[in-house]
C-alpha cells in the first residue's frame, strides 16, 4: 500500500513563542525545498511557518559546532517560569557574557526609523555615573574579568559624563572596551577623537556603517550620513583607533552592498573588521515587513561569499559558543593583500579546551606570507593587545613577532532572534547580554522582546498565566 508523505522532512523539536502574543509554543524544525523552517502553532493565533535558514548543509554544520558551556561566576535570577521568562542570567542559561552592553542613555542625536532601542532626541534619560558604576560592578560580579564591555545608548558620545564613564570602566577588570556610536561627534570633534585615543590599547569604536547610498541611509537612519561617516573614518584613521564597522541589513535594501562594505573596510588603516546585523523585529521598525524583508544568517553568509573578493564558503564558519546566531571569518592583512585564515583551521581546534586559542608560529611558509596552523595553547600570553581581547567566543590568534592586531581583519554575522524565529535552544546559548540597573544580565534576543522599557508589564501577564 502506498502511503502519503509529508511535503517536508522533520528534523527536530524545540520551543518558541507566538509572534503575536509572545506565549510559549511548541515548534518543529523541518527541511523543505532546500530551506529550514520553523513550524509553530499558537492556540490563540494558529499556525506560523518561519524561514530559519536557506542552507540546510550549513544549518546541519552548526549542530556540529558545539563546545562545553562557559559559565558566569554567579546567577542573577532563579528558574521559575522557564525560558525565556526568567532572564537573567538564570541557572538554566548555557553561556556567560562574552559581550556585555551598558546603555548609558536613551537620548540620541538621530531618530533612526530602524532602532531596537527606540532612541531619539525626544527621549530624556541620562543614567547618572553612580548607576553606571553599579552596572559595571554587576558585570564584574558575574565575570570576574570581563571580555568585552560595550558602552551604548542612545548615542553614548553625547552623555555629559562620557569620559568619566570610560574612566570608571578602565578602573575595572575589563579586557576590551568598546563604544557603539553613529559617528557624528567623531566626525565633527577632532579633539574628542584625540582624547578617545588615550584609552588605547584595549579600546575600540563600533561604528554604524550601513550603506554608501543616500536613499538607503534615509530609509534606515532618516539622514544622509555619507559625509559624516567619511569624516569619522578620517579621524579614526588619523589616530589609529581600532574600529569595527557595523552594518544593519534589510533584505532588498542594502544587502547588495555587503561586498563593497567589506572591501572598503580592508582599505582603512583603523578598521579591524565588519559586523553584519540583520534587522531584529524589535523596537522601532518603520517601513519594515518581517514577512518579506527579514534576512537569515545563512542569506547574509551566502552574500558575503558571493560578493566578497576574499572569502569563500570554507571561510565563514559558525562561532562555537552560539552557532545559530554567530558566524565568522578571519583574514590577514599584509602589504595590501587579504588572506583568509578560517578555512585552514581544523574545526576541532575551535571546539577543544575551555578557551579557544589559535596559535600561528613563524616558519618558512609564514615568511612567504602563508600562515600555517601549528599548535593549540590554552593559556597564551600575547605580546600585543590584539585579538585575544575581542569576543571571547571567537578563536584567539597569536601572531608572530612584528605583527599585531592591525594585521587581522574579521567579518562577523550577528543574527539576533525575534518574536518570529526565537528558539529557546539558541536563546540559552546567547552570549551578548544587556546589563540592567537592577543587577541582571539579559540576553540581547529576549531583552528587546520582554524586558526593555515598559515591555516587562506584559511579561508579568504571561508569567501569571503560567502559575495559574
Predicted regions and their residues:
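Radical SAM enzyme core and accessory elements
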Residues: 1-81, 330-468
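Generic domain-boundary/flexible-linker signal
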Residues: 29, 53, 123-126, 160, ...
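Conserved alpha-helical substructure of the radical SAM core
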Residues: 34-58, 63-198
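Short, solvent-exposed loop/turn segments at secondary-structure junctions
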Residues: 45, 212, 250-252, 281, ...
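Glycine-rich, histidine-containing beta strand-loop boundary motifs that form or position
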Residues: 104-106, 116-119, 153, 181, ...
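A short, flexible beta-alpha/helix-coil linker loop
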Residues: 118-122, 212-215, 281-282
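Radical SAM/AdoMet-radical enzyme domain recognition
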Residues: 133-150, 159-278
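Radical SAM enzyme [4Fe-4S]-AdoMet core and its adjacent flexible, acidic
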Residues: 220-226, 238-403
Amino acid at each position: 500500500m502506498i502511503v502519503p508523505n509529508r511535503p517536508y522532512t522533520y528534523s527536530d523539536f524545540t520551543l518558541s513563542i507566538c509572534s503575536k502574543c509572545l506565549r510559549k509554543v511548541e515548534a518543529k524544525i523541518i527541511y523543505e525545498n532546500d530551506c529550514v523552517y520553523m513550524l509553530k502553532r499558537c492556540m490563540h493565533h494558529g499556525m506560523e511557518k518561519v524561514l530559519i535558514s536557506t542552507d540546510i548543509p550549513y544549518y546541519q554544520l552548526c549542530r556540529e559546532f558545539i563546545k562545553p558551556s562557559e559559565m558566569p561566576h554567579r546567577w542573577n535570577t532563579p528558574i521559575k517560569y522557564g525560558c525565556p521568562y526568567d532572564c537573567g542570567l538564570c541557572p538554566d542559561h548555557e553561556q556567560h557574557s562574552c559581550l556585555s552592553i551598558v546603555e548609558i542613555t536613551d537620548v540620541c542625536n538621530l531618530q533612526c526609523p530602524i532602532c531596537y532601542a527606540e532612541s531619539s532626541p525626544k527621549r530624556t534619560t541620562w543614567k547618572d555615573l553612580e548607576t553606571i558604576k553599579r552596572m559595571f560592578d554587576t558585570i564584574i560580579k558575574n565575570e570576574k574579568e570581563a571580555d568585552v564591555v560595550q558602552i551604548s545608548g542612545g548615542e553614548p558620545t553625547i552623555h555629559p559624563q562620557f569620559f568619566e564613564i570610560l574612566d570608571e570602566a578602565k578602573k575595572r577588570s575589563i579586557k576590551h572596551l568598546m563604544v557603539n556610536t553613529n559617528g557624528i561627534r567623531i566626525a565633527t570633534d577632532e579633539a574628542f577623537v584625540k582624547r578617545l585615543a588615550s584609552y588605547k590599547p584595549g579600546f575600540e569604536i563600533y561604528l554604524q556603517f550601513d550603506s554608501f547610498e543616500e536613499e538607503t541611509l534615509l530609509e534606515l537612519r532618516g539622514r544622509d550620513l555619507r559625509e559624516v561617516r567619511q569624516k569619522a573614518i578620517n579621524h579614526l584613521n588619523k589616530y589609529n583607533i581600532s574600529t569595527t564597522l557595523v552594518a544593519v541589513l534589510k533584505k532588498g535594501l542594502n544587502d547588495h552592498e555587503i561586498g563593497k562594505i567589506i572591501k572598503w573596510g580592508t582599505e582603512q588603516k583603523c578598521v579591524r573588521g565588519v559586523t553584519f546585523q540583520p534587522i531584529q523585529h524589535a523596537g522601532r521598525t518603520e517601513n519594515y515587513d518581517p514577512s518579506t524583508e527579514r534576512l537569515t544568517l545563512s542569506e547574509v553568509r551566502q552574500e558575503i561569499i558571493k560578493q566578497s573578493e576574499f572569502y569563500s564558503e570554507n571561510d565563514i564558519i559558525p562561532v562555537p559558543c552560539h552557532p545559530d546566531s554567530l558566524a565568522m571569518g578571519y583574514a590577514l592583512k599584509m602589504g595590501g593583500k587579504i588572506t583568509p585564515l578560517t578555512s585552514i583551521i581544523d574545526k576541532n581546534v575551535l571546539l577543544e579546551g575551555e578557551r579557544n586559542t589559535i596559535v600561528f608560529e613563524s616558519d618558512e611558509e609564514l615568511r612567504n606570507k602563508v600562515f600555517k596552523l601549528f599548535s593549540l595553547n590554552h593559556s597564551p600570553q600575547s605580546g600585543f593587545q590584539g585579538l585575544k581581547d575581542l569576543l571571547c567566543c571567537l578563536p584567539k590568534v597569536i601572531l608572530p613577532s612584528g605583527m599585531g592586531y592591525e594585521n587581522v581583519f574579521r567579518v562577523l554575522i550577528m543574527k539576533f532572534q525575534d518574536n518570529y524565529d526565537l528558539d529557546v535552544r539558541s536563546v540559552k546559548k546567547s552570549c551578548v547580554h544587556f546589563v540592567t540597573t537592577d543587577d541582571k544580565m539579559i540576553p540581547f534576543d529576549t531583552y528587546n522582546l520582554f524586558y526593555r522599557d515598559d515591555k516587562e508589564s506584559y511579561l508579568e501577564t504571561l508569567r501569571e498565566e503560567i502559575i495559574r
